[in-house]
Amino acid sequence: MVRPAAARGALPAVIVIHEAWGADAHIRDVAGRIASAGYLAFVPDLYAHGGTRPAELAPDRIDALKRFADTLPPGGLGDPEARRRGLEGMAETERERIEESRRAVFAGIKNPDRFVDDLRGAVDRLLDHPDCNGQIGTVGFCLGGGLAGLLACDDGDVRATVAYYGAPPPAARAGTISSPMLGIYAGKDRPITDTVPAFADAMAAAGKSFDHRVYPGAPHAFFNDTRPSYRVRASRDAWARTLTFLAEHLG
């Protein structure tokens, strides 16, 4: 956990939910920025279920997968033909390690229930923490953006939800969402962004608060300033909206 060094007393808490790359240096840096804005920031490592990451999700293996992804077209990790071409010429052991890590990452994306359970545990931990004043929000990115929305469907203790370019919850679940929600989306991020209008309509019909912004021309992961996808102007605007939203709903 991270908190402002000079702050006194209990603070609102924000759970920072990591991308598919895990709780890496970028996510820890984001947590530091949130703490600097006056919050208790907590980054659960969802890949370390039970306290230890499996070998295929170890940081060095994830870094190798990132480097491989950077050699592919956008979305290439999910494209079998693009992966096949990218893996050509690699040693067999290296190919196997990259594919093993990719399968592990995508398994979590496709089956998020365990991660949501772990996030409920993170909420409970914060509610019992002396540095938390009981006001809890989430800010999630990519995989974590989708998880933030799912957590809001199931946990009434979450008071504010910010989802960066994560798939919204199913429209049928809009009525179960307990907190106001801010969605940050990328124009060049189909099919995720294509699902936003139906979700927005469902939230409005259910009387729920859902503010959202789609950044035209921005790719998935445009906020990650360690990746080629980073876009400065979209990131500046999205971050300003995020801090305003957290201040409004968490104090």
Residue ranges and their predicted role:
Residues 1-251:
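N-terminal cap/leader regions of alpha/beta-hydrolase-fold enzymes
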